[in-house]
C-alpha cells in the first residue's frame, strides 16, 4: 500500500525545483530536469491507480493520462500526470511507459487529449487536428501494433461522434480510453486463466518484462500466466533474462516478481542456453509486440535467441499476448517494421560510456521469432497451436479490424 504521506528526499543543487513546484509541474505534465529530485510517495491522481492489489501502470483519470515512470524503477516510484499529447508521445518514445498493451492505452489517452487541446467548434477541423496528433503518437514506437490499434479505434470513435458536435466528440473519446483500459485488464485475466495450466513445475525462463507494468491493470501477459500458475500451487522458479540494453528484466521483471513473492533468479542474457542444457529450465514464456498473420512474433531483442535455444533442448516456448497484438495485415515476420533505437543505449550505462568512441552500433529493439519455434500462443480467447494462420485469423476476427487512419477527415 502507498504511504499515507509522500516521502521526499532532496539531493539536488540549490536551484532544484521545490517539492511543491515538482508536484505542480508533474501534475501539469511538464518535462524538466529532475535528476536531483526523488518522489518516492504517491499522491493525487496517482493514488487512485496504485494499490498493491490493483496496480495500474497507466490509466485515464480526470482528463489526464496517469502513469508510473518505468525508467526510474526499481529505485523510485515516480508517477506522471500528462495533460497533452506531446507529453504522452515523449513518455512512449522514451519508454517511461512501455509494454505493448500499456502504450496502446497511453496512446488512446493521447488521442483524447488532442481533442481537448484545441477549442475548435468546427468538427471537421477538430477531426483533422486529432488525426494529425494521432499520427505523431503512432510514429513513437513503430513495432508495437497495439499502439496503432488503439489509435485507429479512437479515430473511428471520433468520426462516429463527429455529427453530434465537438463536445460530444470529446466526451466519447474520453469514455473510450476507459473502455480500452477496462478491456485490457479483462484480457490480462483471461490470458492468465488460459495459460496457467500450461506452466510446468520447475524453472520458467522469461525475457524482457511482461508483468503489471505492461497493462492497464491485471498482472500483465506472460508474467500474469506465471503468477496465476504459482497461485494455483505450481512449484515453479522464474529465471529472468536481464534483457540488454534497457535491462527490463533486471529492473522491471525482478521488481514485479519480488513484489509478488515469486521465487526468481536474475540471469545474464547469454546464460539461458546453459541453464537449459543443465536441466534448470522446463518452459519459456514471453510476451509479444506484434504477431503476424502466420504467427511469426516480434518481441524484445533476444527473444529469438531464447526460442532457438529452447527448440534445441526440446523445451516448450510460449507467447502470451492479447488479440490487439495480432496484425493480420502483416503476412509474415519479415514484413514487421523493427524499431532501431539510439546507439547510446549500447555504448553507455547510466550515462557512463563503456565503448570506444567512433564505433558503429546496431541497436534493433526487437527481433522476430518464426512461428515454427512457438509451441503455443496464449491469448484472451484461448490457446492457439501451430500452424497459426487460421487460429490467428479467427482470433483477430473477434476484434475490430485494423484500419490505418490518414491525417485527413
Map each language-model feature to its residues.
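Intrinsically disordered, low-complexity segments enriched in small polar residues
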Residues: 9-20, 30
Amino acid at each position: 500500500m502507498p504511504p499515507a504521506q509522500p516521502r521526499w528526499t532532496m539531493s539536488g543543487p540549490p536551484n532544484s525545483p521545490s517539492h511543491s513546484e515538482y508536484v505542480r509541474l508533474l501534475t501539469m505534465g511538464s518535462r524538466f530536469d529532475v535528476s536531483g529530485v526523488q518522489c518516492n510517495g504517491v499522491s493525487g491522481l496517482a493514488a487512485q491507480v496504485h494499490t498493491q492489489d490493483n496496480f495500474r501502470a497507466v490509466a485515464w483519470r480526470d482528463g489526464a493520462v496517469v502513469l508510473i515512470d518505468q525508467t526510474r524503477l526499481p529505485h523510485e516510484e515516480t508517477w506522471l500526470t500528462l495533460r497533452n499529447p506531446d507529453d504522452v508521445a515523449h513518455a512512449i518514445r522514451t519508454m517511461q511507459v512501455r509494454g505493448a498493451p500499456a502504450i496502446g492505452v497511453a496512446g488512446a489517452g493521447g488521442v483524447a487529449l488532442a481533442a481537448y487541446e484545441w477549442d475548435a467548434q468546427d468538427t471537421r477541423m477538430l477531426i483533422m487536428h486529432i488525426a494529425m496528433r494521432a499520427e505523431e503518437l503512432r510514429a513513437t514506437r513503430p513495432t508495437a501494433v497495439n499502439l496503432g490499434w488503439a489509435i485507429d479505434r479512437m479515430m473511428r470513435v471520433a468520426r462516429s461522434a463527429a455529427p453530434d458536435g465537438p463536445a460530444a466528440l470529446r466526451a466519447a473519446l474520453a469514455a473510450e480510453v476507459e473502455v480500452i483500459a477496462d478491456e485490457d485488464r479483462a484480457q490480462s485475466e483471461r490470458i492468465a486463466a488460459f495459460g496457467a495450466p500450461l506452466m510446468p513445475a520447475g524453472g520458467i525462463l522469461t525475457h524482457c518484462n511482461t508483468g503489471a507494468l505492461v497493462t492497464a491493470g491485471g498482472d500483465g501477459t506472460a508474467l500474469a500466466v506465471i503468477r496465476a500458475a504459482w497461485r494455483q500451487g505450481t512449484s515453479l522458479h522464474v529465471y529472468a533474462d536481464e534483457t540488454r540494453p534497457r535491462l527490463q528484466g533486471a529492473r522491471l521483471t525482478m521488481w514485479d516478481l519480488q513484489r509478488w513473492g515469486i521465487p526468481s533468479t536474475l540471469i545474464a542474457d547469454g546464460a539461458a542456453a546453459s541453464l537449459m542444457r543443465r536441466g534448470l529450465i522446463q518452459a519459456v514464456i514471453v510476451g509479444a509486440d506484434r504477431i503476424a498473420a502466420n504467427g511469426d512474433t516480434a518481441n524484445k531483442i533476444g527473444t529469438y535467441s531464447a526460442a532457438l535455444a529452447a527448440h534445441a533442448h526440446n523445451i516448450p516456448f510460449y507467447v502470451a499476448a492479447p488479440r490487439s497484438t495480432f496484425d493480420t495485415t502483416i503476412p509474415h515476420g519479415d514484413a514487421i517494421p523493427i524499431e532501431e533505437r539510439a546507439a547510446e543505449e549500447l555504448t553507455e550505462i547510466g550515462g557512463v560510456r563503456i565503448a570506444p568512441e567512433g564505433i558503429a552500433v546496431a541497436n534493433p529493439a526487437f527481433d522476430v521469432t518464426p512461428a515454427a519455434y512457438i509451441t503455443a500462443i496464449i491469448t484472451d480467447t484461448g490457446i492457439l497451436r501451430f500452424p497459426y494462420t487460421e487460429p490467428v485469423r479467427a482470433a483477430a476476427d473477434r476484434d475490430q479490424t485494423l484500419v490505418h487512419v490518414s491525417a485527413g477527415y
